[in-house]
């Protein structure tokens, strides 16, 4: 009888020792910790909700091709880049306002004010004044300021990105190019004006030259020589019927 009592007492003590002492020692995956899983799910749901709200307030980023030309205005140019500039051309101007054209379109004047990064430059396009005595140009040309040039061909023949707007000292400057083109390849029915059509073939064509402009190379601004239209000239060739 005593042996049976001892056996029951030992079984009771073993059962007490085998029971869990607290919920702190229970593994995270057990049903004893539903608060952790519920909290995690609640946080995940809240994060997804916040992400959806953020997408509604902030539009999706644009594609790379859409940012190719717009990103140039966001690049801040170091002022030292203009101090190191060489081979300045009177046909390239940085200004916050459209540059003026002279009344007779024979000269180009850059104003030396706070809105311009260029020095006071005046380029004469005529060596003598034009008198009203029937003087005409061989070819008719037109000169304009180009304010939206985005691409150009550099001196190596590669197509480069031209910076339209330049951010410098908390100001945005527009890069202008003074270009000259032919109005008409044939000012007269025979070709160029004043050419003997009996012995010569002639036509007017636009020629170009290289000027130093601010371009983009990766995410940095750099000076490069690019090609722009600068003149209208007459091309002549002797007629074949004169030979023989």
Curated annotation (Swiss-Prot):
Chain segments annotated as coiled-coil in the UniProt record: none
Membrane-crossing segments per the record: none
Propeptide: 19-125
Post-translational modification: N-glycosylated.
Keyword Mitochondrion: no
UniProt keyword annotations, A-Z: Cleavage on pair of basic residues, Disulfide bond, Glycoprotein, Growth factor, Lipid-binding, Metalloenzyme inhibitor, Metalloprotease inhibitor, Protease inhibitor, Secreted, Signal, Toxin
GO cellular component: a single term: dendrite
Annotated glycan sites: 148
SS bond list: 139-204, 182-232, 192-234
SMART domains xref list: NGF (SM00140)
Subcellular location: Secreted
Alphabetical list of SUPFAM superfamilies matching this protein: Cystine-knot cytokines
Any Pfam family hit: NGF
Expression sites (tissue/organ): Expressed by the venom gland.
Signal peptide boundaries: 1-18
Subunit annotation: Homodimer; non-covalently linked.
Other information: On the 2D-gel the determined MW of this protein is: 17.5 kDa.
Family statement: Belongs to the NGF-beta family.
Protein known as: Venom nerve growth factor
Organism: Macrovipera lebetinus
Lineage start: Eukaryota, Metazoa, Chordata, Craniata, Vertebrata
